[in-house]
Swiss-Prot record:
EC numbers for this chain: 1.2.1.12
Gene Ontology MF terms: glyceraldehyde-3-phosphate dehydrogenase (NAD+) (phosphorylating) activity; NAD binding; NADP binding
Gene: GAP2
Protein name according to UniProt: Glyceraldehyde-3-phosphate dehydrogenase 2
Taxonomic source organism: Kluyveromyces lactis (strain ATCC 8585 / CBS 2359 / DSM 70799 / NBRC 1267 / NRRL Y-1140 / WM37) (Yeast)
UniProt family annotation: Belongs to the glyceraldehyde-3-phosphate dehydrogenase family.
Subcellular location, record wording: Cytoplasm
Keyword entries, A-Z: Cytoplasm, Glycolysis, NAD, Oxidoreductase
Residues annotated as catalytic: 149 (nucleophile)
SUPFAM superfamilies: Glyceraldehyde-3-phosphate dehydrogenase-like, C-terminal domain, NAD(P)-binding Rossmann-fold domains
Disulphide-bonded residues: none
Length: 331
């Protein structure tokens, strides 16, 4: 049994808790969020506009959530270094704040007594692991990153295609649902002017490091992929459009067959496959990192192809966070 604490009780933090509660080997002992009181944490956990009401019983006392009779301590500390992780024998701290995402800042959880840290965001300093892609390279590192939801979607598909046909170069667009950093109406956003525009009424071009990050988890693709994002007014579920130049000639049917085989074997549960006439809402709550849409892709020539793959950027990603926690706990 691995004892876990969650720092940051936002979209990912709350879903990670839901998923962890279904895993017999994971016990969440505490959550921390300086902006959320205990009663409000109970309310936010119980009701979710996107994923629906929590199926179990949720209540609270002065300093704990009580979920199906089990207590989870709630803290409201701004500085993770002051958290009592040692006192509560925390094995792994999950940092889902989006703030403490580098080695030096995530170290605060170690200073507080946690044995290891899993960061739920891409990191420029912590090693990144994508389950299904490079988790076999995990070698006991103390602080690790689960990369981004988009990297988790793109990397399994890129790995399969590259192994079978070789990728010479590629461009990715993610058509991405709105997230918490966006604005309900036009507002100040000094670092990203477009990002400050009304989320519900615009298609907003944005930058993403997700494609370049694939090169960190798959070194053979370093420098071969880059990409961008379009933020669109849907609440959840996003889709990656990957256009690649292949090293070997292939038919679209051959490409589909290779991806389907991987989805049924080594990447089962990570990479899904569908030939149905699906739309984004069909993937709400899907636990795969990536679901290849065989009917949506197109091919121009034997070496030039566009591949389309869906992901629940909240639920699929949060599922992988818990997978990575279990992996780190074993090693």
């Amino acid at each position: 049994m691995v004892r876990v604490a969650i720092n940051g009780f936002g979209r990912i933090g709350r879903l990670v808790l839901r998923i962890a509660l279904s895993r017999p080997n994971v016990e969440v002992v505490a959550i921390n969020d300086p902006f959320i009181s205990v009663d409000y944490a109970a309310y936010m956990f119980k009701y979710d506009s996107t994923h629906g009401r929590f199926a179990g019983e949720v209540s609270h006392d002065e300093n704990s959530l009580i979920i199906d009779g089990k207590k989870v301590l709630v803290f409201q500390e701004r500085d993770p270094a002051t958290l009592p992780w040692g006192e509560h024998n925390v094995d792994i701290a999950i940092d889902s704040t989006g703030v403490f995402k580098e080695l030096d800042s995530a170290q605060k959880h170690i200073d507080a007594g946690a044995k290891k840290v899993v960061i739920t965001a891409p990191s420029s300093t912590a090693p990144m692991f994508v389950v299904g892609v490079n988790e076999d390279k995990y070698n006991g590192e103390t602080i690790v990153s689960n990369a981004s939801c988009t990297t988790n979607c793109l990397a399994p598909l890129a790995k399969v295609v590259n192994n079978a046909f070789g990728i010479e170069e590629g461009l990715m667009s993610t058509i991405h649902s709105i997230t918490a950093t966006q604005k309900t109406v036009d507002g100040p956003s000094q670092k990203d002017w477009r990002g400050g525009r009304t989320a519900s009424g615009n298609i907003i071009p944005s930058s993403t490091g997700a494609a370049k990050a694939v090169g960190k988890v798959l070194p053979e693709l370093q420098g071969k992929l880059t990409g961008m994002a379009f933020r669109v007014p849907t609440v959840d579920v996003s889709v990656v459009d990957l256009t690649v130049k292949l090293a070997k000639e292939a038919t679209y049917d051959e490409i589909k067959a290779v991806i389907k085989k991987a989805s049924e074997n080594e990447l089962k549960g990570i990479l899904g496959y569908t030939e149905d006439a699906v739309v984004s809402s069909d993937f709400l709550g899907d636990t795969n990192s990536s679901i290849f849409d065989a009917a949506a892709g197109i091919q121009l020539s034997p070496k030039f192809v566009k591949l389309v793959t869906w992901y629940d950027n909240e639920y699929g990603y949060s599922t992988r966070v818990v997978d990575l926690v279990e992996l780190v706990a074993k090693n």
